[in-house]
From Swiss-Prot:
CDD domains: FMT_core_Met-tRNA-FMT_N, Met_tRNA_FMT_C. The gene is fmt. One of its GO terms (cellular component) is cytosol. Pfam families: Formyl_trans_C (PF02911), Formyl_trans_N (PF00551). This is Methionyl-tRNA formyltransferase. It comes from Dictyoglomus turgidum (strain DSM 6724 / Z-1310). It catalyses: L-methionyl-tRNA(fMet) + (6R)-10-formyltetrahydrofolate = N-formyl-L-methionyl-tRNA(fMet) + (6S)-5,6,7,8-tetrahydrofolate + H(+). (6S)-5,6,7,8-tetrahydrofolate binds at S109, V110, L111, P112. SUPFAM superfamilies: FMT C-terminal domain-like, Formyltransferase. Attaches a formyl group to the free amino group of methionyl-tRNA(fMet). The formyl group appears to play a dual role in the initiator identity of N-formylmethionyl-tRNA by promoting its recognition by IF2 and preventing the misappropriation of this tRNA by the elongation apparatus.
Length: 314
């Protein structure tokens, strides 16, 4: 099967690396190079990096809709299928209709739950116990197409967005390699999604990065994991931004009235203990404004914390 692969971030690169030895990837389409980091250096996507290393032709159109030149390029390549994994742009119907098997998408959720751009982050932030990948036939709607196959995995307590993304990428690659031959041989038909069960996973807003210390402890813990390894969950300490990348939650009932967000313990083994609605959030990895990431021990030593100090919502 002649395949054009559409993808951009590390999630997509892992899938491409896993499937490329077994499939005929004739070209890769990825997002244009963009400035990144503090120095705003122009960087190419992980997918482009890998494709170049393997000698796979790369295309980086600025736009797809109404791009006649790109349409003709895709048509001239004579693909049998487009395989898409976190490309980052909506692929117009006229392009999806070029190959006989259409567009086949790897989506990092158990559809119809968590349609949209941020299924991994949303699943963790909502404290879900499991998630998975879906292989679906693409159509005009956002992740609304019929589904060929689904595979589930548990979300473990130590999973964050980064670790879960890697697991789901490998799972998606395995599932793709199983279903593509069945699709080609006409042995697997996609099943329509149950619309009444659909939920959506839009990108997280800047406001959702800020910790509300009045939320339940589990929710804050899930928020921190959903925002790690980047951009990090945000709070304010001594008038400056502080990002938190790793924490543990311990359920506990307090007899006395303590304001949520208050430092109640400094434990060299467990972390910085912060009072939350229904327990203690143990902070483990932090990044003060303008500084590098550090362990809780480095933070405790550098900032000489006081019991009773508070992390603020703003």
């Amino acid at each position: 099967m002649r395949i054009i692969y559409f993808g951009t971030p590390e999630f997509s690169r892992i899938i491409l690396e896993r499937i490329s030895p077994y499939l005929n990837i004739i070209a890769v389409v990825t997002q244009p190079d963009k400035p990144k980091g503090r120095g705003k250096r122009i960087m190419c996507s992980p997918v482009k990096d890998f494709a170049i290393s393997k000698g796979i032709p790369v295309y980086q159109p600025e736009k797809l809709k109404g791009n006649k030149e790109f349409f003709e390029i895709i048509r001239s390549l004579n693909p049998e299928a487009l395989v898409v994994a976190s490309y980052g742009k909506i692929i117009p119907e006229d392009i999806l209709n070029i190959p006989p098997y259409g567009g086949i998408n790897v989506h990092a959720s158990v559809l119809p739950k968590y349609r949209g751009a941020a299924p991994i982050e949303r699943a963790i932030m909502n404290c879900e116990k499991e998630t998975g990948v879906s292989i679906m036939k693409m159509e005009r709607g956002l992740d609304t197409g019929p589904v060929y196959a689904i595979r589930k995995i548990p979300i473990l307590p130590d999973d964050n967005r980064g670790t879960l993304s890697i697991k789901l990428a490998h799972l998606g690659a395995e599932l793709l390699l199983e279903v593509l031959p069945l699709i080609k041989d006409g042995k697997l038909s996609p099943v329509p999604q149950e619309e009444s069960l659909a939920t959506y996973a839009p990108k997280l807003s800047k406001e959702e990065e800020i910790i509300d210390w009045n939320m339940r402890g589990e929710k804050i813990w899930c928020q921190i994991r959903a925002l790690s390894p980047e951009p990090g969950a945000m709070t304010f300490f001594r008038g400056k931004i502080l990002k938190i990348f790793k924490a543990d939650f311990e359920e506990k009932i307090f007899n006395e009235e303590i304001i949520n967000g208050t430092i109640i313990e400094q434990n060299k083994k467990r972390g910085i203990g912060v009072k939350v609605n229904n327990g203690i959030l143990w902070l483990l990895e932090l990044q003060p404004e303008g500084k590098k990431r550090m362990s809780f021990l480095e933070f405790m030593n550098g900032y000489r914390l006081n019991i009773g100090e508070r992390f603020e919502n703003s």
